[in-house]
Amino acid sequence: FNKRFGEKSAAEIIGFLNDYMSRMVNCISLAGGTVDKFEGDAIMAAWGVLRDESLDFEKLDHFSPEYKKAYTIHEKHKKEDAINAITAAIAMRYALMEYNKKAMEFTRAHEVEGDVKFKPMIRIGCGINTGRATVGFMGSNDKMEFTSIGDSVNLASRTESSNKPCGTDMLIT
């Protein structure tokens, strides 16, 4: 990221990031995801965090009908959330392909004019992991942020960072 934009103005970098983030967030939202945070050019998202489903069923007798019903619903949602996260990642790949196609056309048009303007081709890496996370507003009286923390979140982050050395754009654990 820094290599491509090192000589660009702050306004150009922010403009690019806003365009890129809008495209990616749209894919996440359409697949039922919730954006947790932006970290530089990275987006952290989660699925199932705003559902009213409670894990209180785990306190029930495991042989009771109430437990079985709640557990079945919970397992169904876990599978749906995983599929939706993968769907978002695939949609992000397609949105990025469309962006890169337009960026190439823009750059070619400006090369003909002898102008040095260009739009960079970009790649993304998606790291997908399923599991429990602690989710909520965290911080201090001065600043609170909605975020997700936990082992499953850390593994997703490490998985994402493995894309570049692996030569991939999506890794799923």
Residue ranges and their predicted role:
Residues 40-41, 121-123, 141-143, 167:
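Active-site lining segments that contact anionic ligands and/or coordinate catalytic metals
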